[in-house]
Amino acid sequence: MQQQTTLPAASLGLAASLALVAVLGPAGIDMYLASMPAMARELHTSYANVQLSLTVFLLALGGGQLLCGPLTDMLGRRRPLLAGIAVYIAAAVWASQAEQLHTLLLARTVQGLGAALTLVVVMSMVRDVADGVKAAQLFALLMTIVGLAPVLAPAVGGLLDSYYGWRAVMLALAALGALTLLNSALFLPETLPPARRIAPQGMHRTYARIAFDRAFLLPALALSAAFFFLFAYIGGASLVYQRDFGLSAGSFGLVFGATGVAVLLGAMASGRLVSRHGVARLSVAGSLAMLGGAALALLGAWAGAGIAAVVPGMFMALFGLGMAEAALMAMAMGSQQRALGSTAALLGAIQMSLSSLATPLAAGLSERGPLPWLLFLTVAGLLVSWLTLATARIHPAHATSLGAH
């Protein structure tokens, strides 16, 4: 069947509504980064312990998807989506009232579970309505809009923290959730009709079938490595930029947001180029840019150039990430034709579970200075490139057919 290579207005509207939902996860990660040093002081704990609030969020975001995926295949997409957003809102309010670290960690775990449900639904809805090039373009458009989160969230969070403290940042996440809940209730339709729903019997067999399919597993691992890179950057950036490079919380938010623009631009480039070059080539080009940018930042910092080298290098790396992620996502999701909720759940679980390991490692390395942290990022970039090249080798025929439609 011949597919369109341009997106109709209805798809643009759907992508905008889905992107608002998809922003909840990144906002829950990025918006409070500048607040972490202040949170450590107020809660009388270490920076590394406050970083655990990010780690548990990511673990819940990953593990929760394994439970949520079959649920969305059985019940449809709309009701689980609204429930997940409501949980996210309640947990954000709870986190804003935390007086001790363990309360914050519990609230962030619950918030991650709510975000897990929303992420599964977003991924599944795209594949419910599109495949091939159109799906890749929708994922790229989604990532372009979601790319605003790492640009705006740290800046907004830094400003809120400067004037009102970190608790206001958590309440802002609750307000974003409320806006998303209203928009979803009004404008997001059900995309999985009852005839296409499947019972959750044999959930473990479904997951095993998907996981052992190399057409799924390799792009899933490559995408997970790319997000490991991203969260390794996130996990160390706040401390390195503020302690070693002397930025204030507000200035950090602006600089971090500026590097986040690169993800948005990379996703935009991916959406424009995918029909011409195919998903495999784009993913390889993006992964090599990640490696090159990280190496540039490392060499510049080693030579004493400081932030003047780190920011351009990370801009290049994050541009590559934005280009690669939509292509890798399309290859992983395109490997399956049914149980798409379970496919999205397994992809998200692998992605977030591996990514969650990056934040404590990066936090520990960043406490030793910029060079160990940047070396860690360069090694992560090398892993992304290796896995992406392996993915491209098993996807050439598939990628060619996508590019031709």
Please report, for each region that a protein language model flagged, where it lies by residue.
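Paired small-residue
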Residues: 87-94, 102-110, 308-316
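Cytoplasmic helix-loop-helix junction between adjacent transmembrane helices
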Residues: 107-148
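Helix-loop-helix hairpin linking two adjacent transmembrane segments in secondary transporters
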Residues: 103, 132-133, 140-186
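Juxtamembrane intracellular "pre-TM" segments in multi-pass secondary transporters
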Residues: 2-7, 189-220
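Helix-to-loop junctions at the C-terminal end of transmembrane segments
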Residues: 65-76, 266-279
